[in-house]
């Protein structure tokens, strides 16, 4: 009984409004009332009206809605609905939606306070939870893009995706326009340079005139320097391979005459300043054939020393693993002739490009986030607090991944056209990399400790990753602490347990053998697991994604393919280097794709700045505000630090870390 003020918010995207009428019902603990056809929702507007209700409803539990269409279906994007009881109590209820309303079925929006099954002892929301998950499991089914990989969402086309997983119009227009621009630029570069010679390293400048960053220009000018080569293992686009050596690698076989090198390495090892980057993952991967021309791969090992000034300097490069019955592979040194040493470094940089794009970026960023997305939609109803906590960090992931499978890594896609791992090698590499998806490697406190990078003052990735993890962890603990007061509450939450099990056993194909949990036994363990999911979708992906434009635009620093075999002798010349590096077309296409993926995104939500409010009430809002305050402090401190650095490290700066895997 009484008067209610109802406010309905419609999204801002181009087609968010609807010409169809919307009917509403209020559902409370003690009754339900139909409000009738209340509005035709208008794009980017909050529409408010009052209703007089003759029934006593008690505390509101749901708003039900139905969109009625006459002749033409017109989808509506509903942000949220708020209902305020006018009178003595002035109770206000928040019903988040943030999805498309399609068809003429009745949809129920539960109140935004959120609860677990344990926190709903009367079972007021039980039927809704079960119905929602039943519908979602039909919409979100597991699929397998390639045998031997972790699972993905079923469906090979964008139209196979649930409508709520597709780009809104602004994002779609920007993405497709940038793709068209990149292809136009590629055609122009090819036509302008079709008759030009391709004989010196300076010739790469002829295609280096669009989409450059300040750091990319620095890379062009300094890429041959050993200090910049070493720096990239610490703070470049792929800081995930470097580890402190605890012994000399078994694969490092010293040919006769290399006793002095062995002594130098053992000296650095004893001092704790010896590091390694091992690309053994590339061993025995089948190399691509592009336009009937064989391409080539190596599996390098790089040994580096950390100097007192913080610089990481290469000491030796081995391009092949030793083979039984063969002579030890040559070891390339900084004292070798300049072109010999440069070619060895180019092989390392090309190998790093392959491993970056396939393992660090696609597998450990995009495909992992897809597993989290599908499992979340299948196992957690919208009223569940973990759903509310994690769903802003899953936005657009399914569409961007379907686009990647259809364009980048598809048959005859970009990888097949220009990458030395294309033509099937990329799938083989992903399959082999799956064995290294350990739980600890997704948690920076564990991963950095395992790799011996804690305390390395010149590893800004390590410092920033650890700090960002801790900030996200406190945020997760703050939200989870509102709903889980005891470890028993975690153990008894069957939806949470199902979600964890779905990720580990189904999505990740039995990853318990790599340390992923199949159940959550305490509040601390649950918080750690959720933090891992959010960090992977935000900070970790951004640390890998954002460096592409800076480090991969100058093609000799990250060759997409190599056109001659890895050297086995030390007689390389400039002609050898140019004949090995990508040709004009391959280089131009690499630059265009890197620009499209690495450019500043105009449609981008920074970490923690999502506008969607899935929680209602002051307590979750206070936790989110504290999270944003900590992110702002970190952002400012990184800005101050970077002013003193020769090369600023930006990739984990919260203001440019994206809130989800959306590009």
Curated annotation (Swiss-Prot):
Main location: cytoplasm
Family: Belongs to the lipoxygenase family.
Domain comment in the entry: The PLAT domain can bind calcium ions; this promotes association with membranes.
GO MF: arachidonate 12(S)-lipoxygenase activity; arachidonate 15-lipoxygenase activity; iron ion binding; linoleate 13S-lipoxygenase activity; phosphatidylinositol-4,5-bisphosphate binding
Gene name, Swiss-Prot/TrEMBL: ALOX15
Top EC class of this enzyme: oxidoreductase
Domain of life: Eukaryota
InterPro entries in the record: LipOase, LipOase_C, LipOase_C_sf, LipOase_CS, LipOase_Fe_BS, LipOase_mml, PLAT/LH2_dom, PLAT/LH2_dom_sf
Name of the protein: Polyunsaturated fatty acid lipoxygenase ALOX15
PANTHER family noted in UniProt: LIPOXYGENASE (PTHR11771)
Positions in coiled-coil regions: none
């Amino acid at each position: 009984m009484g008067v209610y003020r109802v406010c309905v918010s419609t999204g801002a995207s181009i087609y968010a409004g609807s010409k169809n009428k919307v009917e509403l019902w209020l559902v409370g603990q003690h009754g339900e009332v139909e409000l009738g056809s209340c509005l035709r929702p208008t794009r980017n507007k909050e529409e408010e009206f009052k209703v007089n209700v003759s029934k006593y409803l008690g505390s509101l539990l749901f708003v039900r809605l139905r969109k009625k269409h006459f002749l033409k279906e017109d989808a509506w994007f509903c942000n949220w609905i708020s209902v305020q009881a006018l009178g003595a109590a002035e109770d206000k209820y928040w019903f988040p939606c943030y999805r498309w309303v399609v068809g003429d079925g009745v949809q129920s929006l539960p109140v935004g306070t959120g609860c677990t099954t344990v926190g709903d002892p009367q079972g007021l929301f039980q039927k809704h939870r079960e119905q929602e998950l039943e519908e979602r499991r039909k919409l979100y089914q597991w699929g397998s893009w390639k045998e031997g990989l972790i699972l993905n969402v079923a469906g090979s086309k964008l139209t196979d995706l649930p409508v709520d997983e597709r780009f809104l119009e602004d994002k779609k227009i920007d993405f497709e326009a940038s793709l068209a621009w990149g292809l136009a630029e590629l055609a122009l570069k090819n036509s302008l340079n079709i008759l030009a010679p391709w004989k010196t390293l300076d010739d790469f400048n002829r295609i280096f005139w669009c989409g450059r960053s300040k750091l990319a220009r620095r890379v062009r000018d300094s890429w041959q320097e050993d200090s910049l080569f070493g720096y990239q293992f610490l703070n470049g686009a792929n800081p995930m391979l470097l580890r402190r050596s605890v012994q000399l690698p078994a694969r490092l076989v010293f040919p006769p005459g290399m006793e002095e090198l062995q002594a130098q390495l053992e000296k650095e090892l004893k001092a704790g300043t010896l590091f390694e980057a091992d690309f053994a993952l590339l061993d025995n991967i089948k190399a691509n054939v592009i336009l009937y021309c064989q391409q080539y791969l190596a599996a390098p090992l790089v040994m580096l020393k950390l100097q007192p000034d913080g610089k990481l300097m290469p000491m030796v490069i081995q391009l092949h693993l030793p083979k039984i019955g063969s002579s030890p592979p040559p070891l390339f040194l900084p004292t070798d002739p300049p072109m010999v040493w440069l070619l060895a470094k180019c092989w390392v940089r090309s190998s790093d490009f392959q491993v970056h794009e396939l393992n660090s970026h696609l597998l450990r960023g995009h495909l992992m986030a897809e597993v989290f997305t599908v499992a979340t939609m299948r196992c957690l109803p919208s009223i569940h607090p973990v759903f509310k906590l994690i769903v802003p960090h899953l936005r657009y992931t399914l569409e961007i991944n379907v686009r990647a499978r259809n364009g980048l890594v598809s048959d005859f896609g970009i990888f097949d056209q220009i990458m030395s791992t294309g033509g099937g090698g990329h799938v083989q590499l992903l399959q082999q990399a799956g064995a290294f998806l350990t739980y600890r490697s997704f948690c920076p406190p564990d991963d950095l400790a395992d790799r011996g990078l804690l305390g390395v003052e010149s590893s800004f990735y390590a410092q920033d990753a650890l700090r960002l993890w801790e900030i996200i962890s406190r945020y997760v603990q703050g939200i989870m602490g509102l709903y889980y007061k005891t470890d028993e509450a975690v153990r008894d939450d069957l939806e949470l347990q199902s979600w964890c099990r779905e990720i580990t056993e189904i999505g990740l194909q039995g990853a318990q053998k790599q340390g992923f949990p199949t159940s959550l036994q305490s509040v601390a363990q649950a918080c750690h697991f959720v933090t891992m999911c959010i960090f992977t979708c935000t900070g970790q992906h951004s640390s890998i994604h954002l460096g592409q434009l800076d480090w991969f635009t100058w093609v000799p620093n990250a060759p997409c393919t190599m056109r001659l075999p890895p050297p086995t002798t030390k007689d390389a010349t400039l002609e050898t280097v140019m004949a090995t590096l990508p040709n004009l077309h391959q280089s131009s296409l690499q630059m265009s794709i890197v620009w499209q993926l690495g450019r500043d995104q105009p449609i981008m939500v920074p970490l923690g700045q999502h506008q969607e409010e899935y929680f209602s009430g002051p307590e979750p809002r206070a936790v989110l505000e504290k999270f944003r305050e900590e992110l702002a402090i970190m952002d400012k401190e990184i800005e101050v630090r970077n002013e003193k650095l020769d090369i600023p490290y930006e990739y984990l700066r919260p203001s440019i870390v994206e809130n989800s895997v959306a590009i």
